[in-house]
Amino acid sequence: MTNSNLRTENHFDYVKITLASPERVMSWGQRTLPNGQVVGEVTKPETINYRTLKPEMDGLFCEKIFGPSKDWECHCGKYKRVRHRGIVCERCGVEVTESRVRRHRMGFINLAAPVSHVWYLKGIPSYVAILLDMPLRDVEQIVYFNCYVVLDEGDHKDLKYKQLLTEDEWLEVEDEIYAEDSTIENEPVVGIGAEALKQLLEDLDLQEVAEQLREEITGSKGQKRAKLIKRLRVIDNFIATNARPEWMVLNAIPVIPPDLRPMVQLDGGRFATSDLNDLYRRVINRNNRLARLQEILAPEIIVRNEKRMLQEAVDALVDNGRRGRTVVGANNRALKSLSDIIEGKQGRFRQNLLGKRVDYSGRSVIVVGPKLKMHQCGLPKEMAIELFQPFVIHRLIRQNIVNNIKAAKKLIQRADDEVMQVLQEVIEGHPILLNRAPTLHRLGIQAFEPKLVAGRAIQLHPLVCPAFNADFDGDQMAVHVPLAIEAQTEARMLMLASNNILSPATGEPIVTPSQDMVLGSYYLTALQPDAVKPDFGDQSKTFAGLEDVIHAFEDKRINLHDWVWVRFNGEVEDDDELTSPLDTQILEDGTQIQQWTYRRDRLDEEGALISRFLLTTVGRVVMNNTIIDAVASG
C-alpha cells in the first residue's frame, strides 16, 4: 500500500479557533525537503510562465513550495513516474509526489515590516483598542502613519506614555531634546505604525492588568464599570487561550494552497484566476519594494509610505473594503478577499461545511394537504422511489420479482405497478424527516408518515405550518430518510408532528389554526341574514340525521347556508337559549312537545327525551359531523 492509500483516522474532541503565533504561521508554510533544503517562503509575485505555462519558481504557484502540478513529475521533467516517489530533483528542487498535495501545502510571505490584523483593529468591538484602553481613532492614527505614539516618556516632563504626537509636535520635542541647553539625559522614545502598536501590546502584562481591573471594578459603577468589565473579559480570554496580544500584529502571512485559488486557461488562451492571487501579488510586490528601499537606506518618508501601502495591501487580502478604498479588479468589481470567502450565506462555512448535500435526502416545494392527518405528509412518488430505492431493490430481490440489482433498477425506471406496490410496503411505517430552513428551534425538523401522492410537490398539513414558520407561497422543504432502527424509533417517538403540540420555548400550543382554516370555519358556520327559516315538517328542509343533511348538500338539493331541521338526540348547549320553552304542547298519548328558539323536543310523561330536532344551518351540520368523526377516529 502506498502512503496515499493509507487511511489514518484522527479522533478529535473539538475544534478550537485561536490566535496563531508567528512561529505557528511559519511552521504551516515552512518545510524541510528530504535533501535538507528549507522551502516555503513565497518571494516572487509571478504565477505561471506565459510561454511554458509552468509555475514560476518561488512564485505563487511554485512547485518547490507547494508540490508538483502533475502527479509524480518534477518541474524540469527529469523525474517522471511513481517509481521516483520521494526523490527531490537536484536540478529544480521539486519533490516527486502526488499533485493533490497542492490542495493542502501552504507557503508564507515574510513581511519586511509588521502589519496589524484588520479583524482585530477594525472589528466591532476593536480588540486592539480595548486592550490598549485607547480610542479606536487614535490606534488607527498610529497604524496608518498619521501620528507618533510615546513608548517611553524618558525625562521629558510634558510627555505621557501612549500620548499621540503629530509630525510637527514630535519635531518640536526633538528640538528641545537636542538643544544645547537641554537637561534631558534619558531621551523619550516614540514609534509609529504597526511596529509601535506591537511594542505597546508587548509591554502589556496581562496578569497584572487583570488584577488592577478587578480592584477598580469593585469601586466603580455605571458606564465606567461596564467599560472595565468589557476590557477584563478580553484580557481573561487572552490568558485562558495562552495567546499573546502582540500576535494581533503579523510578521508573516500564510499563503493558502494554490489549488484552493486556482488559475485556469479559457478557450481563447486567456486565463481566469482567483481574486486571491491578485491580492497576494499586491502584498508581495509592496513587500519586495519595501525590503529594497530599506536595503538602500531610502529616506524615512518614502519607507513609511511603503509600509502604509503594505498595511493596506494586507488589509485588502484579509478583508477587502473593511477599511479605506475597496480594491477592485476588471469591470470595477471588488476583489473577493479571505473574509468574503469565509463569511455569509455563500461562504465556506454555511455553503460548503454546514450546507453539504447528504445521501437519502431531497427537497421540493410544499403545498397544502387538507386531507392528510396531522402526522402525515404527502411524498411525491418520483421522490419516494429515489429516496427508498435501496429498500425497494432489496424487497424486489427478496420477493423473487427480480434476480439482481441491475434488473431491479430497470424495473424501477419503468415505474412498474409491482414497484409501486413494493414502494407502498416499504414506506409503510417508515417515518421521514421534514426540515425547513432556517431551523431556528427544534420544531424546524419534524417526523411524518409518508403518503404517496401524484405530482412533484410535498404535501403538508396546514396545522404544522406555524412550527416550521412555513406558508404555501413557494416555500421549499428538505426530506431526510432516517436509516438506522434507532433513528427511526427516535423519529417516531419524539419527532412525530402529532407529539409536538406545545412550543418548547413558551409551553403554549404551537399547533393553532390560522388563515384559511379560521376563515373556512367562519364561512362554514356563518349565518346568512336573509335566509328564511323553514317550518318544522317542511319535507325539503327536515332530515332524520346529520348524514342525510350532508348527502342532500352533496346532491346540491340544499345550499351551505340554508336553515334545516335535523334530528339529533345528543346534548345541545346554547348560551342564547331561553330558560323556558316558547311553547309547550301536550299530545293525546301524554307526550309533550316543547318548542324552543332553535330546537323542538318531544318528551314522554316522565319528561325523558324521546326525540329532538334542531334548527341549524347545513354548514354547522358539516362542521359538527366532522368534529364527531375526528374524535371517534382519534
From Swiss-Prot:
UniProt keyword annotations, A-Z: DNA-directed RNA polymerase, Magnesium, Metal-binding, Nucleotidyltransferase, Transcription, Transferase, Zinc
| Superkingdom, natural source | Bacteria
Tell me the residue numbers annotated for binding Mg(2+): D471, D473, D475
**Principal EC category:** transferase
Give the SMART domains listed for this entry: RPOLA_N
Offer an example of a GO molecular function term for this protein.
zinc ion binding
- What does the entry list under GO cellular component? DNA-directed RNA polymerase complex
**Which reaction does this enzyme catalyse, per its entry?**
RNA(n) + a ribonucleoside 5'-triphosphate = RNA(n+1) + diphosphate
**GO biological processes:** DNA-templated transcription
Query: What name has this protein been given in UniProt?
Result: DNA-directed RNA polymerase subunit gamma
Question: Mind giving the lineage of the organism this protein is from?
Answer: Bacteria, Bacillati, Cyanobacteriota, Cyanophyceae, Synechococcales
